[in-house]
């Protein structure tokens, strides 16, 4: 059995910045998985952990090439799309650099479109 505990990233300055959450995850980011006394962070690390810990319900394909393709797609999002469009970056652009809302929107749309175009090409070529 598992229990989800939502973390509101904006309300009251972001629940991820509260002392209790910071004690679990010093990065003050989501997700954080607590399992059997272990505190795990980062989506891909959690994916790998769950896949290895619960092999009867695999999250990754059985073959090495299939697993590599899934990891490549996940890393495309985790490394190329998400980091430059996440909430911390957008708040920094707004608060510290005073980048106007329309420029932030253009920034976001550009990097998301570029990343997903690459992802679509990879998906088409993997058939």
Task: Show where each model-derived region lies.
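Cytochrome P450 catalytic-domain "roof"
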Residues: 30, 122-127
């Amino acid at each position: 059995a598992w229990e989800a505990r939502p973390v509101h990233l904006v309300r009251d300055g972001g629940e991820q910045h509260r002392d209790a959450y910071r004690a679990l995850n010093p990065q003050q980011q989501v997700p954080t998985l607590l399992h059997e006394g272990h505190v795990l962070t980062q989506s891909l690390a959690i994916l790998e952990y769950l896949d290895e810990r619960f092999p009867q319900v695999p999250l990754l394909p059985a073959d090495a090439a299939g697993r590599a393709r899934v990891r490549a797609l996940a890393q495309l999002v985790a490394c190329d799309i998400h980091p430059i469009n996440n909430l911390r970056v957008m708040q920094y652009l707004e608060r510290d650099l005073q980048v106007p809302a329309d420029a932030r929107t253009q920034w976001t749309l550009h990097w998301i479109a570029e990343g997903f175009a690459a992802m679509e090409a990879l998906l088409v070529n993997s058939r």
